[in-house]
Curated annotation (Swiss-Prot):
Function: Catalyzes the rearrangement of 1-deoxy-D-xylulose 5-phosphate (DXP) to produce the thiazole phosphate moiety of thiamine. Sulfur is provided by the thiocarboxylate moiety of the carrier protein ThiS. In vitro, sulfur can be provided by H(2)S.
Entry protein name: Thiazole synthase
The keyword Isomerase is assigned to this record: no
InterPro entries: Aldolase_TIM, Thiazole_synthase_ThiG, ThiG
Enzyme nomenclature, EC number: 2.8.1.10
Annotated catalysed reactions: [ThiS sulfur-carrier protein]-C-terminal-Gly-aminoethanethioate + 2-iminoacetate + 1-deoxy-D-xylulose 5-phosphate = [ThiS sulfur-carrier protein]-C-terminal Gly-Gly + 2-[(2R,5Z)-2-carboxy-4-methylthiazol-5(2H)-ylidene]ethyl phosphate + 2 H2O + H(+)
Length: 264
């Protein structure tokens, strides 16, 4: 089945995007990415060495260049200015790489997005030619404004970053999905495989996760589980679920031609 995720004009066979933080080491990171089947790998410029620290292990040494599209992100930024500066640095480090994830946080205790600063940063970055995938709240009005600015993917949270609480407001996600003409990728809050499957069944174009895999007892096995969940959820969405019924059950077996126990 030819069902590709398309972001900024590039096609991807996998709809699972995976982060690189919180793993035991880069070897475990690489193993989890491998079994996840992901093609888009995100890394926090402020926390992961991508070449800015010459004396430390470099994540890029563990990632095959021809397999993954790197998605530098601005995790840890609390203002538009910080986020813009961070992604300009990423562009320098990565030879004019412009495929980026914008996130501007509002509170260090809950990591909820600051949508005002996010909108400000998005305007500048899009004007500078970046392909911006943007982390935001599940507010459909904000999502529409980010799309109008020119962001190439909208990434609403399912619940708070790192919470593992799953999808708390499927109705808002549905509104964003229905109005958007760019991919909608759930970002933050996924805790286990069923959360990923539900996101895909709702009609999301993809799911991004990090802690759900890295904080599992067996991250590599969980990465494989997430691969299967995203694929199953997408297939179920395309297949179309049966309608829900209340007190009007229809038997799965036909009633015609059955053997009757009534004596004539």
């Amino acid at each position: 089945m030819d069902d590709k995720l398309v972001i900024a004009g590039r096609e991807y066979g996998s709809r699972l995007l995976v982060g690189t933080g919180k793993y035991k080491d880069f070897e475990q990171t690489a193993a989890a990415l491998d079994v996840s089947g992901t093609e888009i790998v995100t890394a926090a410029i402020r926390r992961v060495n991508l070449g800015q620290n010459a004396n430390e292990p470099n994540l890029l040494d563990f990632l095959p260049k021809n397999r993954y599209n790197l998605l530098p992100n601005t995790a840890g930024c609390y203002s538009a200015e910080d986020a813009i500066r961070t992604l300009r640095l990423a562009r320098e480090l990565l030879d004019d790489h412009r495929f980026v994830k914008l996130e501007v946080l509002g509170d260090p205790n809950n990591l909820y997005p600051n949508v005002r600063e996010t909108l400000k940063a998005a305007e500048v970055l899009v004007a500078e030619g970046f392909d911006v995938l943007v982390y935001t709240s599940d507010d459909p009005i904000v999502a529409r404004e980010l799309e109008q600015i020119g962001c190439c993917a909208i990434m609403p949270l399912a619940s708070l970053i790192g919470s593992g609480m799953g999808i708390l407001n499927p109705w808002n996600l549905q509104l964003i999905i229905e109005q958007s003409k760019v991919p909608v990728i759930v970002d933050a809050g996924v805790g286990t495989a069923s959360d990923a499957a539900i996101a895909m069944e709702l009609g999301c174009d993809g799911v991004l996760m990090n802690t759900a895999i890295a904080a599992a007892r067996d991250p590599v096995r969980m990465a494989h589980a997430m691969k299967l969940a995203v694929e199953a959820g997408r297939a179920a969405y395309l297949a179309g679920r049966m309608p829900k019924r209340f007190y009007s059950a229809v038997p799965s077996s036909p009633s015609e031609g059955v053997i009757s126990s009534v004596k004539s």
